[in-house]
Design a protein with these regions (language model features):
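Residue-level recognition of phosphate/Mg2+-coordinating polar/acidic sites
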Residues: 2-142, 151-153, 158, 172-177
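N-terminal Rossmann-like FAD-binding beta1-loop-alpha1 element of flavoenzymes
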Residues: 164-172
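Active-site metal-binding loops of divalent metal-dependent hydrolases
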Residues: 145
Length: 183
């Protein structure tokens, strides 16, 4: 997937409400800014490789069957190409260009209550070295309270646990306890 100049390779699920998945999460900042979204349906092939493969005689095979066989496109990829690539070019080189950068229209991101992870939060400039709010002593922030583009999955959990430990140790010191005593 590509949005603006950012490229992300990963999986996505096509559902009734749109696309979601690890391949898209990294592109969220660019998509929020209105960047167009494209998908490379054959990321392991060059545009020339694709053009050469589809330029072979197809006999009585339909275009979709020809593309399925020559490029190993699955039903979802073929459906996206048919829906978002219309009208499909007849020339192999032009069709290869569409396959390498198929533009996927979207109307925006899903609502906040459906989010897996969100951007925004307390800016790091508002915190001290122990993740305590500079304007509200004794209030510590960690995990998704912080303003950062958090990755999803195990990385997010690891970062939340790490910042929780960081803030917790700082809170213990703030209360006059030695966090070394509890390890």
């Amino acid at each position: 997937f590509q949005a603006s100049k950012q490229i992300s390779r990963g999986e996505a699920i096509l559902s009734a409400t749109g696309l979601e998945g690890g391949g898209l999460y990294a592109l969220s900042p660019a998509l929020r800014q209105g960047a167009s979204l494209t998908v490379d349906l054959c990321p392991d092939l060059t545009q020339d490789d694709i053009a050469q493969r589809i330029d072979r005689p197809r006999g009585k095979a339909s275009w979709s069957n020809h593309l399925r066989k020559k490029l190993r496109l699955d039903k979802v990829q073929l459906a996206l190409l048919a829906e978002c690539g219309r009208p499909l070019p007849d020339q192999p080189a032009k069709l290869a260009a569409v396959i390498k950068a198929l533009r996927l229209p979207y109307s925006g991101l899903r609502p906040l209550d459906e989010a897996i992870s969100v951007a925004g939060g307390v800016p790091f400039a508002a915190l001290d070295q122990g993740l305590m709010l500079q304007t509200m002593p004794s209030v510590f922030c960690a995990g998704e309270m912080l303003d950062w583009e958090a990755p999803t999955g195990g990385y997010l959990l690891t970062a939340c646990f790490a910042t929780g430990r960081w803030a917790g140790r700082a809170a213990a010191r703030y209360c006059g306890h030695d966090p070394q005593d509890t390890e």
